């Protein structure tokens, strides 16, 4: 069995299992179900899948997205750093890619795989579990993954850039010299020797990073670090309105304005 066959079978098994699990939801969404409201009145409702919490690999699995690309939009993997918006992925678009690839493949798993991958769609199943769920767009249902996308993703790269610029030993020394503070973890041996870093450790690093680099990086570098940290913290608001979303956009725009600093210094 090839790797492609194995991955396809795993994905197909997952989607077939989810169909069985969500069959009651599918039936209720299509036919409706009577439920008594808080005032004791009977109402017919049509429940649907509106939210799916998963880390990035699981997001790709459930949404039939090619690994390395965005499960929310159609931006190419080599252009994910772009600030320009791409067309959003939708369930209808993904299903059309799968059906078109199936038609062209003529029962060849390899040909089907290649046709889907060319469009940044995963090729494990012909019929995703969400394809017949009423009112559901799986790409909209996916929630942000703060741990893997921000702390274990963006912030991990940010720390690496800072270590590359000022040196691991220098950054460790600055971290060890920080005074005690309420709510701050003290890394008495620095951070470069840490292995299998947890999300909690990343969060504690984020609290102290800016203080450790603000007088050694160039102003553009400090601004870039601050912009990404602002974005990470703003993204964790429990609720958002148009004002707080504008704060997020401002932080992201600021980073894109000064991000070339890291390229210029050879990170």
Residue map of PLM features:
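Generic structural signal for hydrophobic core residues of well-folded globular domains
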Residues: 25, 212-216, 228, 232-235
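Alpha-helical bundle/repeat cores within regulatory domains of eukaryotic proteins
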Residues: 222-267
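Active-site palm subdomain of RNA-directed nucleic acid polymerases
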Residues: 34, 217-223
């Amino acid at each position: 069995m090839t790797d492609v066959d194995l991955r396809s079978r795993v994905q197909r098994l997952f989607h077939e299992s989810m169909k069985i699990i969500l069959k009651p939801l599918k039936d209720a969404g299509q036919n409706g179900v009577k439920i008594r409201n808080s005032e004791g009145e009977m109402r017919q409702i049509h429940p649907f899948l509106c939210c799916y919490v998963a880390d990035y690999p699981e997001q790709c699995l459930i949404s039939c997205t090619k690994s390395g690309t965005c499960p929310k939009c159609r931006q190419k993997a080599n252009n994910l750093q772009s600030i320009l918006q791409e067309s959003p992925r939708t369930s209808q678009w993904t299903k059309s890619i799968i059906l078109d690839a199936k038609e062209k493949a003529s029962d060849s798993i390899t040909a089907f795989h290649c046709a889907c991958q060319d469009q940044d769609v995963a090729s494990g199943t012909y019929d995703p579990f969400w394809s017949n769920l009423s009112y559901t767009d799986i790409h909209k249902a996916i929630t942000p993954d703060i741990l893997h996308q921000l702390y274990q993703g963006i912030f991990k790269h940010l720390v690496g850039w800072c270590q590359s610029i000022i040196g691991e030993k220098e950054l460790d020394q600055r971290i060890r010299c920080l005074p005690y503070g309420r709510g701050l973890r003290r890394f008495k041996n620095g951070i470069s020797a840490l292995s299998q870093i947890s999300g909690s450790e990343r969060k504690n690093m984020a609290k102290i990073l800016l203080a450790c680099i603000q007088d050694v990086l160039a102003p553009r570098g400090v601004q870039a670090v601050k912009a990404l940290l602002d974005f990470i913290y703003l993204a964790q608001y429990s609720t958002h309105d148009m004002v707080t979303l504008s704060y997020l956009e401002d932080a992201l725009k600021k980073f894109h304005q000064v991000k070339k600093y890291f390229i210029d210094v050879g990170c």
